[in-house]
Amino acid sequence: TARHIFLSYNNDGDMSKDFIEAIMKRYAVDGSFECITIPYKKYENWKSKNKKEHFEYLFYIEKKANNEVIYESPLNYIGSKAKIIPPIKQNLIPANTFIDVFGGGFNVGINSNYNHLIYNDINFIVKELISSFRDYDTYDYIMYVKKFIEKHDLEKGNKETYIAARAYYNNLPDNKKDIRMLFTIILYSFQQQIRFNSNFEYNNPVGVRWFNDCILSKLISFSRMIKECDVTFLSLDYIKLPKVIDLTNNCFVYLDPPYKLTTGSYNDGKRGFKGWDDKLELELFQFIDNLTAQNIPCMLSYVLEHKGEKNTALEDWINRNNYTYIPLGDIIGISGQPRKEILVLNYDI
């Protein structure tokens, strides 16, 4: 397997410098990426003369081991674990099936390296978004997104065209709604959040993000990986999972629930889905205790402290059950506010 990779490409090609950089950095040992810009003179006639400068880009990376490459979801999901995949992977233990109970953007599941993955999210629309990256041909998906952007004149910060595109989607009958259409609209929304009203109409306001080269690189690499994985998709209240899945059959359970101390689109009102509060948090603790009693290994990602407020119920529960507790330090979320995240394990490492 190649360890050192060089790529020569010029600025007349179809791929942008930013796109190539995003792709290569995904596979690069940290700090190894380099790019040299080499100007050159291209043959010119009277039609092409003085149109633009010409460059040859020479890219270099030292390639990571395959099991160290991190694939990021194209969905900018609130509470995404994309930035803390390494410590999560370091503390996983062997099993045949990995169950991502609160699947969200699927950043953890797609990087977990288990034989069989089970994705679950109570939000059936989010489940459809994630499964769409497996179900559609990636090239066709990208062309659909680009055509929808062009047809509806979508651009970052353009409120008028965004609201019109959003209304177009919301007013379609359910059998005419294409999940790729929703994905495209989300890309131009505020912080690319996934928010719906009680009628399941998408209602996030316009934002200043767009379908850029970074999103494109994530879409391509994530779609390739999810097509290669053996994934089962579910959309259930997690409490019902033991009735559907035999969790005792060589499974590892990963839980990344909403955070009680933070405000996301999942807990500032139910918005057609289940919210999150003290009662539901205690229900979660009991669910994990039940897994522990059956010797089913599980990992919980959660927030211990945020804006000076500590989750004492979480702390007491960890100590009472003698669970393993791993601090991850301050994590900066979408809001820009740091939060103290932890991993809780019901097994020894």
Please annotate each region the language model reported.
Residues 1-122, 241-252, 260-262, 266-349:
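Class I S-adenosyl-L-methionine
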Residues 16, 123, 137, 212-215, ...:
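Helix N-cap and loop-to-helix transition residues
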Residues 68-83, 139-254, 258-269, 283:
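SAM-dependent nucleic-acid methyltransferase catalytic core
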Residues 90, 96-170, 207-208, 212-213:
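SAM cofactor-binding core of SAM-dependent methyltransferases
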